[in-house]
Every structure is written in structure tokens, then in C-alpha cells.
Amino acid sequence: MKGNVIATIVALVIIGGAFYYTTRSPEVASTDNVAIENGKQIVEITAKGRYSPTLTAAKANMPTIVRMETNGTFDCTSQLTVPSIGYKQILPSTGTTDIELPPQKVGASVRGICGMGMYNFEVKFN
């Protein structure tokens, strides 16, 4: 009897999890963190406990700076890797770090990953 109750609870948790992951809406790309200054596109990403926003839409064919902002960041998000450009650095615990990207083609994306591989962000170019 006790085994049946446990099996039922486990089955409900699995079904509920599957329902949650298949019905949630896809993430919408942010544009609020993108500005154009002196002919360059600035994409601001905050690193503290996670990267925010995790998905950004930016303009293609334009020089871009990814501006990483930290404020008391002492977790794995301070160890940033951007594989597509060979960038790997430890960000300051507080401050800003600019990462220059060459103009990207339409449809390209650039992803940043934390030192443990737990958190990431992506900039998609349209």
C-alpha cells in the first residue's frame, strides 16, 4: 500500500514537470538593454548570481560592445567565457568590462558562459 502511494506521487511529479516544461512560453529577447553610442551598439548584461537578461536581440552588421556590469559579484558568473571570440576572463567584483565584438551577420548569436557552465546569456543578431 505504502509503495503504491509513493509510486503515485512520483508519477504525478513527473507528469507535472513534463506539463510545465512543454507548455511554458519561450523566452522573449530583450532590447531594453541595447543602446547605440558613437556608431557602436552597446549591450548591457548584469552578472551577479546569473546573467540578466539571458537573451538579447541586437542589430546585425554593426560593431558591438557587450558591457558586463558587476556589483559585489563573487560567484561563478564573474568567470566569463565567450567561446566564439576566444574570450576568457575573470570580471572585477564591482565595475564594468567592455567586450568588443566585430559586426555579426544576420542570424548569428554570441553566447557567454560562466565558469561552472551553470549560467549563460545569448545575444542574437537580427
Regions from the PLM with identified roles:
Residues 54-73, 97-111:
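Beta-strand cores of secreted/periplasmic/IMS beta-sandwich domains, seen most often
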Residues 25-37, 91-126:
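Extracellular/periplasmic metallocenter environments
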Residues 32-63:
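N-terminal edge beta-strand
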Residues 42, 63, 75-79, 109, ...:
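Exposed beta-strand and adjacent loop surfaces of beta-rich binding modules
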Residues 74-92, 122:
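Histidine- and aromatic-enriched segments that form or immediately flank copper-ligand environments
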Residues 47-54, 82-85, 98-99:
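N-terminal post-signal-peptidase region of extra-cytosolic proteins
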Residues 62, 85, 117-119:
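A generic "binding-loop/recognition-motif" signal
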Residues 1-44:
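Extracytoplasmic entry segments of secretory-pathway proteins
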